[in-house]
């Protein structure tokens, strides 16, 4: 299972949010570019980047995001406010490894499925769930989709992954989160990436045994030093098969 060290940007700073609440971010006083380089130096294969300003239609982080793409030293999976084919192609042309699309997918599934076919392995479907409904517009609007129907609507579209976030689940209720994620993974035709479920090595150990889960985002736990990136990646590796000792 792949670990995606995760950076979330608001007003040029690294932050984490509580249940998607943009009004009370936890601000981490670190340099975004140096932090991203640190992810690469630790051996990460990808990083995930969410631009919370772009979610609100504000492009003020654009220069910083472009700098991260150029200098981080590892491919970036970018989410936040990518709501048209033009925006998706803009970032792909800038060199981003993958674009994460949620709101556009809820409103125009056919266009997003077509985009995934045109850019195979570069489009990730975001499934952000609040009280059993898929949320759009930066988690501010409840759409008409259940998570199950949303995933099913895309059939065999060649997404690079399906990023599942259970926004309202209490972080202490890991069983509920894993239930949602594993249920969607059973139905999905693309590998599922779990978001918002990793607080410790134990959480990674549980997650890696769920079928069709290809990766997990790890953000807050890295910034508050609950777990190191090296520990997270080591834990995510499959356990070695026992080898019989021959005397």
Swiss-Prot record:
Give the reaction(s) catalysed: 1-(5-phospho-beta-D-ribosyl)-5-[(5-phospho-beta-D-ribosylamino)methylideneamino]imidazole-4-carboxamide = 5-[(5-phospho-1-deoxy-D-ribulos-1-ylimino)methylamino]-1-(5-phospho-beta-D-ribosyl)imidazole-4-carboxamide
- Gene3D superfamilies reported for this sequence: Aldolase class I (3.20.20.70)
The processes (GO biological process) annotated in the record are: L-histidine biosynthetic process; L-tryptophan biosynthetic process
Q: State which Enzyme Commission number(s) the record gives.
A: 5.3.1.16
Q: Which UniProt keywords apply?
A: Amino-acid biosynthesis, Cytoplasm, Histidine biosynthesis, Isomerase
Query: Where is it mostly found?
Result: cytoplasm
Pfam families named among the record's database cross-references = His_biosynth
Q: Name one GO molecular function term.
A: 1-(5-phosphoribosyl)-5-[(5-phosphoribosylamino)methylideneamino]imidazole-4-carboxamide isomerase activity
Where it sits in the cell: the answer is: Cytoplasm
Q: Where is the active site?
A: 8 (proton acceptor), 128 (proton donor)
Q: In which pathway does it act?
A: Amino-acid biosynthesis; L-histidine biosynthesis; L-histidine from 5-phospho-alpha-D-ribose 1-diphosphate: step 4/9
PANTHER family reported in the protein's UniProt record? 1-(5-PHOSPHORIBOSYL)-5-[(5-PHOSPHORIBOSYLAMINO)METHYLIDENEAMINO] IMIDAZOLE-4-CARBOXAMIDE ISOMERASE
* Stated name of the protein: 1-(5-phosphoribosyl)-5-[(5-phosphoribosylamino)methylideneamino] imidazole-4-carboxamide isomerase 1
Q: Gene for this protein?
A: hisA1
């Amino acid at each position: 299972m792949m670990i995606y060290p995760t950076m979330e940007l608001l007003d040029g700073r690294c932050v984490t949010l509580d249940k998607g609440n943009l009004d009370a971010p936890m601000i981490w006083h670190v340099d975004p570019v140096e932090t991203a380089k640190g992810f690469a130096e630790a051996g990460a294969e990808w990083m995930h980047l969410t631009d919370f300003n772009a979610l609100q239609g504000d492009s003020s982080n654009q220069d910083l995001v472009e700098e991260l793409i150029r200098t981080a030293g590892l491919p970036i999976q970018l989410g936040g406010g990518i709501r048209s084919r033009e925006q998706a192609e803009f970032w792909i042309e800038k060199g981003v490894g993958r674009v994460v699309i949620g709101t556009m997918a809820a409103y125009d599934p056919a266009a997003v499925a077509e985009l995934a076919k045109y850019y195979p392995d570069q489009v990730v479907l975001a499934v952000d769930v609040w009280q059993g409904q898929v949320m759009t517009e930066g988690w501010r609007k409840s759409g008409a989709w259940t998570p199950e129907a949303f995933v099913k609507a895309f059939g065999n579209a060649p997404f690079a992954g399906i990023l599942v976030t259970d926004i309202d689940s209490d972080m202490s209720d890991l069983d509920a989160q894993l239930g949602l994620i594993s249920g969607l993974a059973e139905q999905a035709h693309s590998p599922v990436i779990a978001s918002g479920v990793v607080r410790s090595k134990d959480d990674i150990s549980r997650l890696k045994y769920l079928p069709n889960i290809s990766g997990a985002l790890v953000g807050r736990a890295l910034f508050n030093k609950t777990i190191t990136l090296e520990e997270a990646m080591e834990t995510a590796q499959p356990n070695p098969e026992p080898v019989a000792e021959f005397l």
